[in-house]
Amino acid sequence: MVLDGFAAHFDAYLENIVREGKSEHTVAAYRRDLEELFALLAQMPSEDAGGVPQGLSQRDFTAALRRLSQRGLNARTLARKLSSWRQYCAWLVKRGLLHTDPTADIKPPKQPERVPKALPQEWLNRMLDLPVDGGDPLAVRDHALFELMYGSGLRVSEIHGLNADDVYLDEAWVHVTGKGRKQRQVPLTGKSVEALKNYLPLRQTASDGKALFTGRNGTRLSQRQIQKRLAQWAAQNGDGRHVSPHMMRHSYAGHLLQASRDIRAVQELLGHSSLSTTQIYTKLDFDHIARLYDEAHPRAKRQDE
């Protein structure tokens, strides 16, 4: 398949993943990654491109990855782009539009292990226990938002997608639609239930009235707005540290694992499809145990202390 033929089904592919229920953010990322790939393949000299006029090969995609690496992209970003390319190639093969998948045997760049940053439990408790101005609907909304974020460990995309009827306050749980449209039920803390009960009577609603967290005009808060409100809240009330929804989720996972030691339960609560994704939080747990050991064990103290 020549390059023109390879790219010819691009729009049909995007329409297909929209029908599958992929989010706008995911579809936009696939679009960017594939448009970038097409441009790279078109720019390659024939000796790099593996004979594009005759067809595309594994060497073409390896060369494209090498070009992106030379631009300074990190291993995580390269692995994500390769995943986007693979999804497209697999779709073409499945429909008989490509004989074999030239990306199938390409190994993604090895990524350095990254330990998530968790916020101190005491700091979070102090911040979330700050007085809330009950006369300010946005302050009441934000408090409910942040309690839910830390209390249930939801992704920012999951919070963005919540509807009011996803929350069951009497039973103290929330129905969450996660990655890949996977459904799960997550418990609510007592603090989250209380904060949501204070917020719901003040919620501004638009014409559809579905969104749980809305702005002044009643429309659903965007992911960017949620991130911005959290950062502003932390900057105004905290000690200057940067706080993101991802860090709140990491904190939830790390603190829960410290208390429960049940990694399978934490996996279910986080909505991870693979246990290996959850296992990174065991490093946070080990750090906590190591600090306790250093503080408590009589043989852990250095001689000069």
Curated annotation (Swiss-Prot):
Keywords attached to this entry: Cell cycle, Cell division, Chromosome partition, Cytoplasm, DNA integration, DNA recombination, DNA-binding
Main subcellular location: cytoplasm
GO BP terms in the entry: cell division; chromosome segregation; DNA transposition
Secretion signal, residue range per the UniProt entry: none
Subunit structure: Forms a cyclic heterotetrameric complex composed of two molecules of XerC and two molecules of XerD.
Function summary: Site-specific tyrosine recombinase, which acts by catalyzing the cutting and rejoining of the recombining DNA molecules. The XerC-XerD complex is essential to convert dimers of the bacterial chromosome into monomers to permit their segregation at cell division. It also contributes to the segregational stability of plasmids.
Protein name in the entry: Tyrosine recombinase XerC
Organism: Neisseria meningitidis serogroup A / serotype 4A (strain DSM 15465 / Z2491)
